[in-house]
A protein has these predicted regions:
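N-terminal beta-loop-helix "entrance" segment that forms/cooperates
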Residues: 35-58, 113-116, 168-174
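Histidine/lysine/aspartate-rich catalytic loop segments that bind and position anionic ligands
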Residues: 150-182
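N-terminal basic/disordered segments at the start of proteins
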Residues: 10-39
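C-terminal functional extensions of proteins
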Residues: 195, 204-216, 224-260
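Internal active-site segments that recognize and position negatively charged phosphoryl groups
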Residues: 124-158
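Short, polar loop motifs at secondary-structure junctions
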Residues: 36-44, 104-110, 123, 143-146, ...
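Glycine-rich, highly charged phosphate/nucleotide-binding loops
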Residues: 50-70, 178-187
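Glycine/small-residue-rich loop that forms an oxyanion/phosphate-binding "nest" at active or ligand-binding sites
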Residues: 64-124
């Protein structure tokens, strides 16, 4: 849906580096009122440059009600590429409330020479792809995706997350590291070598902030079990923060020209 009214109030569905960068670039604009929403899954989120709303909306209907009540003029979905439910709710809510929606979707990674990827569609497939023989696996996944690996307790698992895994992974050998990225390729290469990792399990998150482990696996000639992205709603989308800014500026200029 293209913007048809004067855009002043913007809601950003966040939780990604791109959402934070977008908020930073909009924070100083006196012509806009920007709110950033976070799901609330991180105990101590980073400070944000604009007002923040933490927590869910209660599905698509709840989000639509919020858009109407707060008189939101534009909705930017800058959530993680694997936040399929949130993106689907955003699409339905925007349509119901008559609010223009733009999705900011970073491009997926693609294989380059030297990569050894085993591509899977589900976490359960990733567990099976590890095989029966004991391995040392780096699980570069969200905390919610870890529990299926209890079905394969013979492996040693290395887990790195901002907050502790709760409940802990119920396997004999799980190593948890609390750390907040981004991490460089050199840092991830050192991590993989230090823990003698022989396979990486990752989401195809795209972007540069978490690519270090992919480059490190390539350098160390380690296989990567890559979880494919989920299907996302077909809505207007761009790949960069700069394109979002251009979309907003065009919408604002168009509304001014129409005298809205």
């Amino acid at each position: 849906m293209a913007p048809s009214a004067r855009i002043k109030r913007i809601l950003i569905l966040g939780g990604t580096l791109e959402a934070r960068l977008l908020a930073e670039m909009l924070a100083g604009r006196s012509d806009l009122s920007v709110t950033l929403t976070l799901a609330g899954r991180t105990a101590k989120p980073l400070p944000q440059p604009v007002p923040v709303r933490v927590g869910g909306f209660g599905g698509a209907e709840g989000l639509a009600q919020f858009l109407r009540a707060e008189k939101i003029d534009a909705l930017i979905d800058a959530t993680h590429p694997y936040a399929a439910i949130i993106s689907a709710n955003a699409a339905r809510a925007a349509e119901a409330a008559g609010v223009p929606l733009l999705a900011l979707r970073r491009p997926a990674w693609t294989k380059v020479e030297g990569d050894s990827w085993i591509e899977v569609n589900t976490i359960e497939e990733a567990v099976r792809a590890l095989g029966q023989a004991p391995r040392r696996a780096f699980l570069a996944l969200g905390r919610k995706e870890l529990q299926p690996f209890t079905a394969a307790p013979q492996h040693v698992y290395l887990i790195r997350s901002v907050d502790p895994v709760d409940p802990p992974l119920a396997v004999p050998h799980a190593i948890s590291i609390a750390a907040r990225g981004p991490f460089s390729e050199a840092e991830d290469r050192a991590l993989l070598k230090r823990h003698r990792i022989d396979v990486v399990v990752a989401k195809n998150s795209g972007g540069t902030a978490t690519y270090g482990k992919i480059g490190a696996a390539r350098t160390l000639q380690l296989p990567v079990i890559m979880l494919a992205r989920p299907a996302l709603p077909e809505v207007a989308s761009v790949e960069t923060v700069e394109e979002v800014l251009a979309w907003l500026d065009h919408a604002i200029a168009s509304s001014v020209a129409r005298g809205v």
